[in-house]
Regions:
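Metal-associated gating/positioning segment near the N- to mid-region
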Residues: 85-161, 179-185, 238-244, 265
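Active-site gating/metal-coordination segments in enzymes
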Residues: 172-222, 249-250, 261, 277-295
Length: 533
């Protein structure tokens, strides 16, 4: 039995953790951003908060160093601002005149991989794409660059020595050991070592039940959080109902949820020629999984939902990372690729039997239709879970499947809207709910006195059109009958430091341009040949 457990754990590590990457180029010392200031006053904004309140403005916000100290309504729309009521600026105070702009809490990406060696993405590139889209906190699930590397960058970000979001480190279960974990005692030992190393939680892919339960129990005793991608290699033994009951705090993607909803079978119905290592098999059949689950509103559907609600369980759906499965051409042709996607990352995305998430061996209409139906059921469960009081967060998992860091996160917000979330509910999922799931609700997630000064500032109203948050903006016809680009985050403020979001993206473009010049890196579509001059 011990041999069998060891073998299963080895297979999980080799097949799933095999997609984790070696260390990438470290982030340089910060030279960008102004602040923090002894006192910063942001004047005249409309606040779009995550507390359930409607927008309100004009408002002045006072920040001292990195803490929000005052939030003051200073007038009414269409009338002059009441100067007598405004916070007074003293000598040396930094004042931002943001009249007419919108301010939101800094975004939380609950599934943010810090690049990868296989993708050729240096840390600076990833961090600036995130900051360019208002992302001020990320959770790095599996911490694929290694615990030491991730913890070093976490510490540097906390000290604002690098231009980067706040980082939470969730190493992959079993990582860092030179042998598989084969007993509950070893599982508990690894969890204690993980906590001692300063990690914020654990990312699981699955394990033998006695090992998985021991690890979750020990992790819970230590007060740490956890996340799980319920890989098909182990989900047949522990789906989300079992792992949540054992102490798991967050599930990633959809894995483990339809399996918990089975009411006429106990396992996924795999074709006889299925091979997990063939990723076209893996993801094509995943697109047919939700229709094998219990129907919406059925006894099993309601039972699973109610049990997860009782456990205060968090869903982190990462809708965007599978979005290409519904429309591959759209994902490949996204506006931002030609400007912001590195040639090495573009090559990684292309059809490959080796690169993870590049399973476009023969992807066509039938696969896309199946996935569109899959999304309808998946989104229905997630939206209903939210409506019944469940916690749903926003995570992107970018760097795979034609999803680019930052841009993929905004796409996730659009997909939450498609699932049925109201615009304000989308913002809450992207901010306050992420803060709750991370155990940081006292510090981030909303614009409230005493919290960190993490903000997103932009000229356009994202409640009217989420697309204005994309770094490439959106298209609008002006009064001269001319198409123009509007939107994009203007400033990202993290820890009271003001980052010019468009400058962040300009730096990313420069990194991409250099890579193209050095490697003749024109981005060609798969199968397309470069034309000879």
């Amino acid at each position: 039995m011990k041999y069998f457990i060891t073998l299963c754990f080895f297979i999980i590590c080799s097949l799933v953790n095999g997609h984790l990457y070696s260390q990438i180029q470290q982030a340089p010392q910060r030279s960008e951003g102004d602040g923090p200031f002894e006192r910063l006053i942001i004047r005249g904004v409309t606040v779009i908060n995550s507390t359930g309140a409607p927008p309100i403005g004009p408002v002045d916000i006072v920040v001292e160093k990195n803490i929000i100290k005052q939030i003051k309504s200073v007038g009414y729309p269409g009338t002059p601002v009441m100067d007598k009521d405004r916070p007074k600026a003293g000598a040396g105070d930094k004042v931002m005149d943001c009249e007419g702009m919108y301010i939101l809490p800094g975004f939380v990406d609950m599934h943010g991989h810090i690049g990868g060696q296989s993708q050729g993405t240096p840390a600076e590139y990833v961090f600036k794409l995130w900051l360019g889209h208002g992302i001020t906190t990320i959770r790095d699930p599996a911490s694929g660059n290694g615990v030491k590397w991730t913890m070093e960058h976490k510490a540097k970000s906390l000290k604002n020595e690098i231009a980067a979001p706040r980082i939470l480190c969730y190493p992959a279960f079993g990582s860092g050991w030179d042998k598989p974990i084969s007993t509950p005692e070893e599982a508990r030992l690894w969890v204690r070592e993980n906590a001692k190393n300063g990690a914020d939680g654990i990312k699981f892919f699955g394990a033998a039940p006695e090992i998985f339960k021991a690890a979750l129990d020990e992790n819970k005793k230590l007060g740490l959080k956890s996340a799980c991608h319920h890989a098909q290699l182990e989900v047949g033994r522990m789906n989300v109902m079992a792992t949540a009951a054992a102490g798991l705090t967050t599930m990633e993607h959809w894995y483990g949820l339809p399996e918990a909803l089975f009411d006429g079978q106990t396992l996924q119905d795999y074709p006889s020629d299925y091979n997990y290592n063939n990723e076209q098999h893996r993801f094509e059949e995943a697109g047919r999984l939700w229709k094998q689950a219990a129907k919406p509103g059925s006894e099993r559907w309601n039972f699973v939902m109610n049990e997860l609600l009782k456990m205060d369980f968090t869903l982190d759906p990462t809708f965007n990372i599978y979005d290409a499965n519904r429309d591959l051409m759209r994902a490949r042709q996204a506006d931002w690729h030609k400007i912001y996607t590195l040639p090495s990352l573009w090559k990684f995305y292309a059809p490959s039997r080796i690169s993870h998430g590049s399973y476009w061996f023969d992807w066509g209409t039938e696969q896309e239709i199946a996935w569109k139906e899959n999304y309808k059921l998946w989104m229905q469960f997630v939206n209903e879970y939210k409506n019944k009081g469940g916690r749903v967060t926003a995570g992107s998992d970018s760097g795979f499947i034609y999803q680019l860091y930052g841009f993929g996160y905004i796409r996730e917000l659009e997909l939450l809207r498609e699932a049925g979330f109201l615009p304000l509910e989308v913002i809450r999922a992207a901010t306050l709910k992420g803060a709750e799931a991370l155990g940081m609700v006292d510090k981030i997630g909303s614009i409230e006195i005493g919290k960190y000064a993490d903000f997103v500032l932009l000229d356009e109203n994202p409640l009217a059109n989420i697309k204005v948050l994309y770094g490439t903006g959106t298209i609008k016809l002006n009064e001269k009958n001319e198409a123009e680009r509007i939107g994009g985050v203007k400033y990202t403020i993290k820890d009271g430091i003001i980052y010019d979001a468009k400058k962040m993206l300009a730096d990313v473009k420069a990194i991409v341009d250099r890579a193209k010049a050095e490697n003749d890196g024109e981005l060609l579509q798969p199968g397309e040949k470069k034309l000879k001059p």
